[in-house]
Amino acid sequence: GFLPFVKKTCSYQKSKIKGIFADKSYLSYWTNDFDFGNAKPKSPVTSVSWFAAKKYCECQGKRLATMDEWEYVAMADTKKIDARTKKEFNEYILSWYEKSRTYENEIGKTFKNYWGVYDMHGLVWEWTYDFNSIFLSGESRKDKSTDKNLFCGSGSVNASDLMDYAA
């Protein structure tokens, strides 16, 4: 878990993390370096910087998934590798955005997908290794190579094809 990681890795404790690696919201609901306050022990850890998530994975001998890897695994339901054409699958994913405080739910309680992975949808947004590989700025608006169909969160409301959004 994340608590043993911060106990072992002092530089990622709430009171010791450098501003370059996290903003002031880092572990904001924790009452101190080792107490996660009112959060449930089996709920996902939130308010974690990309640097902390990356370091946590490295300490486990793992790495963050790339955006492509995450999306590939996320498009699977319990029986199909690619369930994006299934109406009920898309409705389930999109209904998650209507729910509040999903970060309080217990991990491992959403469906286990085709790959044996739980909680791909229904808890929290997750960091990916290359989350910043698409950078849009005022200067990139005329860039022909940038995918103009990238959007997140409520940006899906007016999407022409919600299937592109759900996974």
Regions found by a protein language model. Name each.
Residues 14-31:
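Core domains of carbohydrate- and sulfate-ester-processing enzymes
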Residues 27-166:
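Functional-site microenvironments in short loops/helix caps that host divalent-cation chemistry
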Residues 9, 20, 134-138:
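Compositionally biased, intrinsically disordered low-complexity segments
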Residues 8, 14, 19, 88-92:
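Intrinsic disorder/low-complexity segments enriched in polar/small residues
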Residues 1-15, 60-62, 77:
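Short capping motifs at secondary-structure boundaries
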